[in-house]
């Protein structure tokens, strides 16, 4: 019998290899045996394996209601808005054993605002066995607990400050402090203060740290001319480590010369700062005292260092000004910046109808004054200043014959009402008045000074550019009678004072009624 020769069996090209199929040991579903993990299907793995085991599902967040910050243990307080990235990061950092898995997604789940609960839904991923990745989502509930931070606790407790800046100016008014207050508010220089206390000759600013007080002192040097003295007081000492605790005091004294003051410079100093005539006006206060000679329009700058080498008092301040009426005015053609030099004849307002005394002088207000206008100025004729510096100027051969009878300072608007309604407002610092409240006379004087400052803001465009003015959206009370409303309207129409355009004003977000519609 013939036998066939053996033939080799080769697999056919293009035939795919099939894997072994097994049944899930738990539910009996057919699965691929070559890629299965422990003979379990994916659904059984999800039901029997918990990759979030060991991760806490509840937590506590501490919130300070005063400064609206959250506690990041052990002692750091961070600012975070509701449902913000910062708050979500803080929530994830508070969970234990979260670092051993991979975070795929995390988001907030809406809760009632008054429930004091924050829910976060977290999606994680981890390797189970034999390269099988499993993804799982779960929710974590945080309870919001109220706790006062250290800074807020210090602000409500006396004598917890570490540094104080005492700002003083030895004058009879606080006009410079009103300007300084607005500059502080505009630049937010008071944000680190724990208390602001008003004193007789100035204001005290209290800080929790020394570097905050030093930063505030640097700000003062950039806006007003000051001289600085510092001291420290030992409050405690550790005998074992040698550590010492100090309280620091910075005394900043502002030059006692204010805007619109009449200044009599010592003759030597007048030559030193630009050979300006010694009798001049202070037209602006900045990092230095800026002086103007109204007879020639010459200007000079008196720095703080130069002043304190030879300090002197102003010859007269704004409380000594009297009202004059312009009888005649003629411009000379000399101009410097906004000022126009003019020759003017004025009469004292109190002398009208009593005598015929008139005074001839030069003024820098040629761009503002017209015959019949009212102007405020200083009366030099017949005035005893009791000043050795002024006596030296009178006896000087060079300047004795140039002393005018009258020095005009600024235009006056007699028809302007005192407490008229303005379309703008200024913010004020939250100051502690101390143990003793101001007397009625002192309060009236402070109101007069503030009203004068508001008028200066209305009249001086350069001054307004350095301040932050806000729209006055406060609703006024409805008059009880129509006659009262008519009288108020007529008075405002007759008001000849300068007004501020709405384009120069900012919106005050504290007065806006913002509602979140959800």
Swiss-Prot record:
Compositional bias of kind Acidic residues: 504-518
What the entry lists under InterPro entries is as follows:
Nmd3, Nmd3_N, NMD3_OB, NMD_SH3
Cellular localisation: Cytoplasm; Nucleus, Nucleoplasm
Pfam family of this protein, just one?
A: NMD_SH3
Gene Ontology cellular-component terms for this entry are: cytoplasm; nucleoplasm
Disulfides per UniProt: none
Q: What keywords does the record list, in alphabetical order? A: Coiled coil, Cytoplasm, Nucleus, Protein transport, Transport
Q: Where is this region: Disordered?
A: 473-518
A GO MF term: ribosomal large subunit binding
Q: Where is this motif: Nuclear localization signal?
A: 410-427
- Show where the record puts the motif Nuclear export signal: 502-511
* Entry keyword Coiled coil: yes
Q: Please give the function described in this protein's UniProt entry.
A: Acts as an adapter for the XPO1/CRM1-mediated export of the 60S ribosomal subunit.
Similarity annotation: Belongs to the NMD3 family.
Q: How does it assemble?
A: Associates with the 60S ribosomal subunit.
Q: What is this protein called?
A: 60S ribosomal export protein NMD3
Q: What taxonomic lineage is listed for the species of origin?
A: Eukaryota, Fungi, Dikarya, Ascomycota, Pezizomycotina
């Amino acid at each position: 019998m013939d036998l066939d020769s053996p033939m080799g069996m080769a697999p056919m090209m293009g035939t795919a290899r099939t894997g072994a199929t097994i049944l899930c040991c738990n539910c009996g579903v057919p699965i691929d045996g070559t890629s299965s993990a422990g003979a379990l299907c994916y659904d059984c793995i999800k039901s029997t394996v918990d990759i979030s085991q060991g991760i806490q599902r509840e937590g506590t967040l501490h919130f300070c209601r005063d400064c609206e910050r959250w506690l990041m243990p052990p002692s750091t307080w961070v600012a975070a808005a509701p449902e913000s990235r910062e708050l979500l990061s803080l929530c994830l950092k508070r969970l234990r054993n979260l670092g051993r898995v991979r975070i795929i997604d995390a988001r907030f789940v809406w809760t009632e605002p008054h429930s004091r609960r924050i829910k976060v839904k977290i999606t994680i991923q981890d390797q189970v066995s034999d390269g099988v990745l499993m993804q799982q989502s779960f929710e974590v509930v945080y309870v919001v607990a109220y706790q006062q931070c250290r800074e807020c606790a210090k602000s409500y407790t006396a004598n917890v400050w570490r540094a104080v800046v005492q700002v003083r100016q030895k004058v009879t008014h606080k006009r410079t402090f009103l300007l300084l207050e607005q500059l502080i508010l505009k630049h937010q220089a008071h944000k680190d203060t724990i208390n602001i206390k008003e004193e007789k000759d100035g204001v005290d600013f209290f800080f929790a740290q020394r570097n905050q007080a030093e930063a505030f002192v640097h700000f003062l040097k950039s806006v007003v001319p000051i001289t600085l003295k510092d001291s420290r007081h030992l409050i405690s000492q550790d005998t074992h480590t040698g550590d010492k605790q100090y309280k620091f005091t910075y005394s900043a004294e502002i030059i006692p010369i204010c805007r619109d003051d009449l200044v009599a410079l010592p003759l030597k100093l007048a030559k030193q700062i630009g050979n300006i005539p010694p009798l001049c006006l202070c037209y602006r206060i900045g990092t230095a005292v800026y002086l103007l000679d109204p007879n020639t329009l010459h200007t000079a700058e008196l720095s703080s260092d130069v002043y304190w080498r030879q300090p002197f008092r102003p010859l007269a301040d704004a409380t000594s000004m009297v009202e004059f009426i312009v009888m005649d005015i003629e411009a000379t053609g000399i101009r410097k910046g906004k000022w126009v030099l003019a020759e003017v004849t004025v009469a004292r307002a109190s002398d009208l109808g009593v005598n015929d005394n008139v005074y001839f002088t030069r003024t820098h207000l040629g761009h503002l004054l017209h015959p019949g206008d009212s102007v405020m100025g200083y009366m030099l004729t017949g005035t005893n200043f009791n000043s050795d510096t002024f006596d030296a100027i009178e006896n000087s051969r060079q300047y004795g014959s140039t002393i005018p009878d009258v020095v005009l300072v600024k235009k006056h608007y007699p028809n302007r009402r005192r407490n008229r309604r303005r379309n703008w407002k200024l913010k004020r610092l939250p100051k502690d008045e101390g143990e003793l409240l101001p007397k009625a006379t002192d309060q009236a004087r402070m109101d007069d000074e503030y009203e004068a400052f508001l008028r200066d803001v209305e009249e001086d465009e350069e001054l307004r550019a350095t301040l932050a003015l806000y729209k006055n959206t406060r609703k006024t009370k409805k008059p009880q009678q129509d006659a009262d409303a008519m009288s108020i309207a007529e008075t405002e129409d007759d008001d000849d004072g300068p007004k501020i355009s709405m384009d120069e004003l900012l919106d005050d977000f504290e007065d806006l009624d913002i509602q979140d519609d959800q």
